[in-house]
Amino acid sequence: MTVRGGATLGMVEGDEFRRDPRITITSVRNSHSDLSQLDTSPSAMEPNGNNKSASRSLLFRILYWIYERRLLRQIHKRSMPRHVGIILVGNRRHGLQRGLSNPREIYRCGAEKLDDILDWCAELSIRTVTLWVFSTENLKRSPAEISGILAAIEAKITALARDPSTHRRRIRVRAIGRLDILSESIVDAIRAAEAATASNNLMTLMIAVAYGGREEIVDAVRALLKAQSAEGASLPDVIESITPEAIARHLYAAELPDPDLIIRTSGEIRLSGFLLWQSVHSEFYFTDVFWPAFRKIDFLRAIRAYQARNRRFGR
């Protein structure tokens, strides 16, 4: 079962907000007496100096804030996913909309969204999040674009390892994929981040880079066969050893739970091989929002959709 979210963008998000008779100007005034968290400075509103536009912008911000709190109240009543995977798509289209042409600038915007995701997952006590930032198929793109993507990834991973909030929130950073095809500098950045956060144990951030689902399964089978060969197993024994459980033990991050929820941004309804083996019982959520524009309410709506599912695990 799939749910498509964010197809219509309105005052806050989709027709749901506009249809709800409980959300009125009066309810905005009365629902929360403390609006101190809102930034009401002129720079946070419309920059054209028009008082009417500024008032309208402030009203929208208040309505958005109220709607976000409503979503939080709804989802806190039910169980959270343990592991959320996100397929980050839409960087280029978002960049075109903003008039950006330099790949480094385009993908830097997407990389900065990572901080928000970590904040939101920490707030909801989600223990594992996997972000697919670069696929093996992305290697077919132009050298300039590949360089821009990998430069943004390397810079963000380096920043994560040095960020005090990473350690304050006890986030462990890991990377999965065919790292051997990456440059030495990005591999060094990955290994440094993994080493710096190895003792953190409240949240795991798994970064899928140079990753492909088919490649992961092939690599797992190869690792299994190599292990059997090293033990001197006969061919019949090797054949007998190939089971779903044995393959699963040789996946890139075998010790982590399978993803409960997989989110894909930008409106494309496919997995493209993301966590191909592990997603057999995952719930999927697709949103039209481009990755750099992905907001907290988009994330909360995905969590709410997940909570509404009846997960039977084949039963």
Regions found by a protein language model. Name each.
Residues 2, 20-315:
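Flexible, compositionally biased loop and terminal segments
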Residues 5-6, 10, 14, 49:
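Residue-identity detector for glycine
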